[in-house]
């Protein structure tokens, strides 16, 4: 009987605090993903923060999303000790897009998130040209981030919103 107590308690705790647990899991996912890409010195940096932050803004609101973006966008850059200027500055367009589309994200997530992701990629390409990044980073990375974001918005975001 005592072996059933811990799993039941964990399930009840998850059901009571699932919004908090999901937020912490998303922060951990974004930070570990970013840290891994920096420590492996990958040439193409597929950032999942733009569309995860759009989901957090739609589900938790802008007051939770702003610290989420700042923590999960900047901390892995310093933790890895290897950061590029464009990756460091990409937090600014992410914040701008989330602030600009915060009201619409809460009412209609999917169409607004698709458009907001395209706006973010446009400003990220401008940022890549301003910071004089490599050619493959200017061309391949925005396309890959857009496709990955569309897949996230289309398939994974509905599953996550079911948990919240």
Can you say where each PLM-predicted feature lies in the sequence?
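Hydrophobic transmembrane alpha-helices
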Residues: 1-59, 155-156
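Membrane-embedded alpha-helical hairpins and interfacial helices in multi-pass inner-membrane proteins
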Residues: 1-5, 23, 81-164
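Short, surface-exposed helix-loop/turn micro-motifs enriched in polar/charged residues
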Residues: 20, 43-44, 67, 85, ...
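Mid-membrane cores of alpha-helical transmembrane segments in multi-pass membrane proteins
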Residues: 26, 46-51, 65-72, 91-96
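Residue-level recognition of pore/gate-forming positions within transmembrane alpha-helices
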Residues: 30-31, 73, 121
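Membrane-helix boundary elements
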Residues: 54-55, 59, 64-79, 83, ...
């Amino acid at each position: 009987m005592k072996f059933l107590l811990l799993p039941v308690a964990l399930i009840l705790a998850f059901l009571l605090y699932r919004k908090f647990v999901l937020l912490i899991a998303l922060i951990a996912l974004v930070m570990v993903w970013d840290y891994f890409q920096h420590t492996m010195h990958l040439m193409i940096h597929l950032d999942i923060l733009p569309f995860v932050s759009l989901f957090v803004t739609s589900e938790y609101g802008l007051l939770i999303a702003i610290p989420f973006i700042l923590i999960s966008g900047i901390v892995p850059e310093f933790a890895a000790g290897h950061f590029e200027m464009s990756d460091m500055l990409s937090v600014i367009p992410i914040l701008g897009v989330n602030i600009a589309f915060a009201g619409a994200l809460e009412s209609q997530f999917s169409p607004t998130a698709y458009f907001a992701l395209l706006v973010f990629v446009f400003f990220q390409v401008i940022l890549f040209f301003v910071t004089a990044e490599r050619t493959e980073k200017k061309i391949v990375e925005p396309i890959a981030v857009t496709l990955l974001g569309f897949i996230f918005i289309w398939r994974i975001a509905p599953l996550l919103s079911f948990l919240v």
